[in-house]
Amino acid sequence: MSKSGNGNGDKVLYCSFCGKSQHEVKKLIAGPSVFVCDECVELCNDIIREETHETHEETEARLPTPKEISNFLDEYVIGQQHAKKVLSVAVYNHYKRLQHKSEDGVELGKSNILLIGPTGSGKTLLAQTLARILNVPFAMADATTLTEAGYVGEDVENIIQKLLQKCDYDVDKAQQGIVYIDEIDKISRKSDNPSITRDVSGEGVQQALLKLIEGTVASVPPQGGRKHPQQEFLQVDTSNILFICGGAFAGLDKVIRERSDKSSIGFSAQLKSKKSSNDEVSKVLGQLESDDLIKYGLIPEFVGRLPVVTTLQELDEAALIDILTRPKNALTKQFQSLFKMEGSELEFRGEALIAIAKKALERKMGARGLRSILENILLDTMYDLPSLEGVNKVVIDESVVNGLSKPILIYEQDEKKSASGSKD
């Protein structure tokens, strides 16, 4: 017992760990026959934090193999097997390069990635999922909002600021993060010839991104403050940040065809229909060369900074149905969880899923259009359900998806009647 008396007869309490008296510390916490002071509590917290951090670092040290990365992507992203393989290898090599600095003097270059695919094919989701499996900070940027320094819009350094925000301004963590720049095709040069006038949202942005993607020390104001001369900047080295750029590149297949048609002019040339199917477009994109991207409007230096290029196919009806049901966080599972919170089961019939997929194909939004379709279908039900009592199940069939009828509500009493009827 850490107690003792003083001359006045009052008992002085002492910390059972460090021996300091109650007068030497701010707070003394009493337990059964022991006392602990606030200083010892703080010290214990520090020890626990350090051990947790060390354990976390040990866990992070193991880099998953390309197969493991691809298998993890399969849990969240449907299809796009070739793109997954390319990404898995590129990301594995990138982080292996960071973990094992070359001892034989061979300097390993950084392999940034370019994803080409239609809207809603899974470009953003692939990049997000990669960051999740590797447990690294992830930031997204829209290339259309970027401008050259000094013009109205976002500076390219703002991308690094977003990355810092994701890891509480831990510079070391940010320097090993992943940055995804979407709509990269929208900053293509407006013509083949270098622009005489300023192109602040096209070629100018490509020039500004060059150094950032290749590797430079970016100066970022701390905690999102505005830039001013007296302020100390955070210095972030972008050499080890993996940049993934994505875009739809509409019309790129025509650029590739023009190039290939030049080599097959004459009697041996095959006549091609004006309209191309999705499979034909995918085959054409498979013949992509760096010169095609330059012809499209990316400057040669920018194309050179993105050595790993892979294409994603447009999702068909079967793939969209799989996206609705198969992934861990599939949309139907998300809405079923919402309805479960209200005590109701949500059921999607097979023909309803087909109708939803067909609607998404009509809108040409790919997987991105699925959520808005489901939101519209379930809006009235989600509005009414919290006010209704005894709704056991909500059923969605094809007619509901096509707007011909309302969702079927099955009440608790109806289920009891049908159950008793079957017994009789």
From Swiss-Prot:
Position of the signal peptide: none
InterPro entries: AAA+_ATPase, ATP-dep_Clp_protease_ClpX, ATPase_AAA_core, Clp_ATPase_C, Clp_protease_ATP-bd_su_ClpX, ClpX_bact, P-loop_NTPase, Znf_CppX_C4
Domain named ClpX-type ZB: residues: 1-56
One Pfam match: ClpB_D2-small
Keyword annotations of the record: ATP-binding, Chaperone, Metal-binding, Nucleotide-binding, Zinc
Family statement drawn from the similarity comment of this UniProt entry: Belongs to the ClpX chaperone family.
Assembly and binders: Component of the ClpX-ClpP complex. Forms a hexameric ring that, in the presence of ATP, binds to fourteen ClpP subunits assembled into a disk-like structure with a central cavity, resembling the structure of eukaryotic proteasomes.
Protein name: ATP-dependent Clp protease ATP-binding subunit ClpX
